[in-house]
From Swiss-Prot:
Residues 1-17 form the signal peptide. One of its GO terms (cellular component) is cell surface. Haemophilus acquires iron by extracting it from serum transferrin (TF) in its human host. Acts as a transferrin receptor and is required for transferrin utilization. Keywords: Cell outer membrane, Lipoprotein, Membrane, Palmitate, Receptor, Signal, Virulence. Residues 276-292 have a biased composition (Basic and acidic residues). The keyword Membrane applies. Coiled coil: none annotated. Residues 587-605 have a biased composition (Polar residues). Gene3D superfamilies: 2.40.128.240, 2.40.160.90. The gene is tbpB. Residues 25-52, 99-125, 275-298, 584-610 are annotated as: Disordered. This is Transferrin-binding protein B. A lipid is attached at residue 18 (S-diacylglycerol cysteine). It comes from Haemophilus influenzae (strain ATCC 51907 / DSM 11121 / KW20 / Rd). It is found in: Cell outer membrane; Cell surface.
Length: 625
């Protein structure tokens, strides 16, 4: 999308891209050396250092690891490792792999249904938002490179469909569910706990839960493998336990026996921590080493959780999932929206009048209904990763030494190449930007469809300041069209070359006023007025642009001025409302009856279109005046 001149108030304006944000700025005429008005700079007191995550700890909707088999022509163990962990954007990846490997059409064991309210609860313990388990075949062989493998083929996996956006701000929630595991292999090594495997589990192939003589009769107690969790949302701590159940027989009593404790920290709607074995010196099983654990909360209100872990000795990989207990459901834990994931989709493609058929008309109607609209998407709160087609893509800054204020990078997702433009380096709790499918050969978006995003971890309502007037300064991405000509903003590595967003927030009156400006002259393009009088952490209001002219030929009388008045939505992010962000669209429809003959404000322009996303950081006065 190439920028063209924009005319406002009789002046020819050229808008560039994303914003300014760090550094200092004057609130009056900086050319006046005697100015005594204050200067401002970013408040860095609540800056968050981006987590340096290994592959296993990168947040995603789900993932898994393949079962392994022992090379029967050698003695070297087949260990599990982090490189073998696969991030899943869809369970179809497992399905496609099985079509290739299961050529003898062996019957599969387990299920890879994606989470749904209508799926059979027997297979997934009644869970709706995240599943975990095994999916495998019991007969598989491979001869390659002088090696011979024989065993099971399949995956241990977990997968969720909807990340949590609303969570308790205090209090404790308990969850109960299941877990599954796979092990490494070592030739000739056997463990007594895997008594159901006829000597195969661990010595020739990955041992799995079915190799344990588990209780299967509910009359004797709980059955199978059990996971239990307690999440304290006040202290941001997650505790858990992983059990197996020893089957009651004539020779042994029923027993629910713990193998692991879980100790993790909660980060927005994800958690990271450790699994800790309860029997470090056991010779009966391989569950003896501490491991790395990561997972998250799923369902709109965090009704379920799921995740995975890998033992430090690379001998055990586990997956787990659980749902709220009835005890938690009966509690009245204070909950509010804390995680934002917003996606605005718009197309710059003009209709082709020469191919107007009934079928095309229906397609155009569907496209127009979705065009310049915003929807909720799954996100991970910390705003370090964006999901594109359900696959996590890292956002800036990617390294501590990166000097880029905004970034533009290509990523491969499901055989497609996307260009992702993200802003801004100085924002810790909210990120925004745009992505689109890109042809790397000609650096062109041939689909002419674009996606603006906003991700963030909101400030808890109780932590929103109640007094004071605060300035915020940041950046914005935008697209504006008058129906014939358009202009768009794009990011720049240099902070001083980005378009500016400025806001004044009165926390006592719960009002916000802002302006989205050009990068060069600082003249306003959109003005924003909003309030957060409902006492929450979000604001709503109106974004207005008046008498704008987009002129591709730079002649101030060529195109008709446009007027836009539309609803703006946003929120405060980070500790003590240290950042803010928001978005708005305009698709030719008026939020109120601005087109009536008696309307006092200028009529909205029916053919105009706009999509805007912005973010800003709290400012503090500098000592330099």
């Amino acid at each position: 999308m190439k920028s063209v001149p924009l005319i406002s108030g009789g002046l020819s304006l050229f808008l560039s891209a994303c914003s300014g944000g760090g550094g200092s700025f004057d609130v009056d005429d900086v050319s006046n050396p005697s100015s005594s008005k204050p200067r401002y700079q970013d408040d860095t007191s609540n800056q968050r250092k981006k987590s340096n995550l290994e592959k296993l700890s990168i947040p995603s909707l789900g993932g898994g690891m393949k079962l392994v088999a022992q090379n029967l022509r050698g003695r070297e163990p087949s260990l599990l490792n982090e490189d073998g962990y696969i991030i899943f954007s869809s369970l179809s990846k497992i399905e496609d792999d099985f079509k290739k490997e299961n050529q003898s059409q062996e019957p599969t064991i387990g299920s890879i249904d994606e989470p749904s309210e209508t799926n059979s609860p027997q297979n997934h313990h009644g869970q709706q938002y995240v599943y975990s388990g095994l999916y495998y075949i019991q007969s598989w062989r491979n001869f390659s490179n002088g090696k011979f493998y024989s065993g099971y083929y399949g995956y241990a996996y977990y997968f969720g469909k909807q990340t949590a956006t609303t969570l308790p701000v205090n209090g404790e929630a308990t969850y109960k569910g299941t877990w599954s595991f796979i092990t490494a292999t070592e030739r000739g090594k056997n463990y007594s706990l895997f008594s159901n495997s006829s000597g195969q589990g661990y010595s020739r192939r990955s041992a799995i839960s079915e190799d344990i003589d588990l209780e299967n009769d509910q009359n004797n107690g709980e059955t199978g493998l059990i996971s239990q969790f307690s999440a304290d949302f006040g202290t941001k701590k997650l505790k858990g336990e992983l059990f197996y159940t020893k089957r009651k027989t004539n020779n042994q009593n029923y027993e629910k026996k713990k193998l692991y404790d879980i100790d993790a920290n909660i980060y927005s709607n994800r958690f990271r921590g450790k699994v800790k074995p309860t029997e470090k010196d056991s010779e009966e099983h391989p569950f003896t080493r501490e491991g790395t654990l990561e997972g998250g909360f799923y369902g709109p209100n965090g009704e379920e959780l799921g995740g995975k872990f890998l033992a430090g000795d690379k001998k055990v990989f586990g997956v787990f999932s659980a749902k709220e207990t009835e005890e938690t459901k009966q509690k009245t834990l204070p909950k509010e929206t804390l995680i934002d994931g917003k996606l605005t989709t718009f197309s710059t493609k003009k209709p082709d009048a020469t191919t107007s058929t009934t079928a095309n008309a229906k397609t155009d109607a569907t496209t127009n209904a979705e065009n310049f609209t915003t929807k909720d998407i799954s996100s991970f709160g910390e705003a370090d990763y964006l999901l594109i087609d359900n696959y996590p893509v890292p956002l800036l800054p990617e390294t501590e030494n990166s000097g880029d204020f905004a970034t533009s990078k290509h990523y491969e997702v499901r055989d497609k190449t996307y260009k992702v433009e993200a802003c801004c380096k100085n924002l810790s709790y909210v990120k925004f930007g745009m992505y689109y499918e890109d042809n790397k050969k000609n650096n062109k978006n041939e689909t002419e469809q674009y996606h603006q995003f906003l991700l963030g971890l909101r400030t808890a309502s109780s932590k929103i300041p109640t007094t004071g007037n605060v300035k915020y300064r940041g950046s914005w991405f935008g697209y504006i069209s008058d129906g014939e000509t358009s202009y768009s903003t794009t990011g720049d590595k240099r902070q001083d070359k980005n378009a500016v967003a400025e806001f004044d927030v009165n926390f006592a009156e719960k009002t916000l006023k802002g302006s989205l400006k050009r990068a060069d002259s600082q003249n306003p393009v959109f003005s924003i007025e909003a309030n957060f009088k409902n006492g929450g952490n979000a604001f709503t209001g109106t974004a207005t642009a008046k008498d704008l002219v987009i002129d591709g030929k730079n002649s101030q009388t060529k195109n008709t001025p446009i007027n836009i008045t539309t609803k703006v939505n946003g929120a405060f992010y980070g500790p003590n409302a240290s950042e803010l962000g928001g978005y708005f669209t305009y698709n030719g429809k008026n939020p109120t009856d601005k087109n009536s003959p008696t309307a006092s404000s200028p009529s909205n322009s029916e053919k105009a279109r706009a999509a805007v996303v912005f973010g800003a950081k709290k400012q503090v006065e500098t000592n330099n005046k």
